[in-house]
Each structure stands twice: as structure tokens, then as C-alpha cells.
């Protein structure tokens, strides 16, 4: 999971992004709200290439103050339910930092399988790296 704080965009950029997502057959956005504010969201995108239209990748972000409340689990279940009903989507994919053990455990609990790894893909500081683990789940 990525921190919501890392997703820096202007209000206008957010509005344009949400408009695009709500009018797309290849993209989905599900938002978790708590006490009138966005607590997190999950976004799915499927490529417009015909040979890859059966696949898609998602990213999930939960704000720090709303973690450990089951929102990630709820958002992931919502996305997978949507993907299972989608007429084209057969495979849902993600990338997760190897240091994010809690997220990896959640994805495995939902049936995601590791299919690859980008070694030292993410650099946190001087000589501090993490792999980017690629995972997928078949939904058909």
C-alpha cells in the first residue's frame, strides 16, 4: 500500500482524474470515507490494447490515521467483486514493496500469487532498497 500522503495532486487534477475514471469502462475508483473525509481509495486501470484488455492493475492508498481499521480489506474486496462481474477482466495485478509485509499478507489472503520481482526497484535512502513484488489473481 502507498500512503495517501504520497499522492500529491492539486484539487483540479483530482477533479479531472475522478471525472475520467467515472466515465471509463477500463478504469474504476472506489473511495472509503470516514467522518466526511477520504480515508483511502483503490484505483484500477486496464490497458486499452486489445490483447491486454483482459488484465488490469490496481493501487490502493490508506491515510495513516485510518490504517488498521479494515479499510484496505474492504476496498480490495470491493474491487475484486467488481472485477469478477466485469465482462472483460480476467486478471487483476499489483506491485507492492517487499518491505510492506502487511500488505503482502493481505494480498496472499485474498489469493494473489507472486509472479515476479523487480530487484532493488525502490530506493528509500543511501544504500536502502526494496524489491517491487508483482502479484496477480485470476478472477474468472
Predicted regions and their residues:
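Short, surface-exposed loop/turn segments at secondary-structure junctions
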Residues: 1-5
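Acetyl-CoA-dependent GNAT
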Residues: 6-65, 76-77, 138-140
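Localized chelating/binding microdomains
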Residues: 21-22, 37, 44, 72, ...
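Loop/helix-junction capping segments adjacent to catalytic residues or to phosphate/diphosphate-binding pockets
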Residues: 52, 69, 101
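Conserved acetyl-CoA-binding loop-helix of GNAT-fold acetyltransferases
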Residues: 62, 68-83, 104-109
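Conserved GNAT acetyl-CoA-binding A-motif
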Residues: 76, 83-95
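C-terminal "cap" of GNAT-fold acetyltransferases
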Residues: 90, 97-104, 110, 117-140
Amino acid at each position: 500500500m502507498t500512503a495517501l500522503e504520497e499522492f500529491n495532486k492539486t484539487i483540479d487534477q483530482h477533479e479531472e482524474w475522478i471525472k475520467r475514471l467515472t466515465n471509463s469502462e477500463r478504469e474504476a475508483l472506489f473511495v472509503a470515507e470516514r467522518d466526511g473525509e477520504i480515508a483511502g481509495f483503490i484505483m484500477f486501470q486496464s490497458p486499452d490494447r486489445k490483447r491486454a484488455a483482459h488484465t488490469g492493475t490496481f493501487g490502493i492508498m490508506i491515510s495513516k490515521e485510518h490504517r488498521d481499521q479494515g479499510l484496505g480489506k474492504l476496498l480490495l474486496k470491493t474491487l475484486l467483486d467488481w472485477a469478477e462481474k466485469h465482462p472483460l477482466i480476467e486478471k487483476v495485478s499489483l506491485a507492492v514493496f517487499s518491505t510492506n509485509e502487511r500488505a503482502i499478507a493481505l494480498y496472499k489472503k485474498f489469493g494473489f500469487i507472486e509472479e515476479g520481482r523487480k530487484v532493488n526497484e525502490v530506493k528509500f535512502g543511501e544504500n536502502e532498497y526494496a524489491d517491487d513484488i508483482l502479484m496477480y489473481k485470476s478472477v474468472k
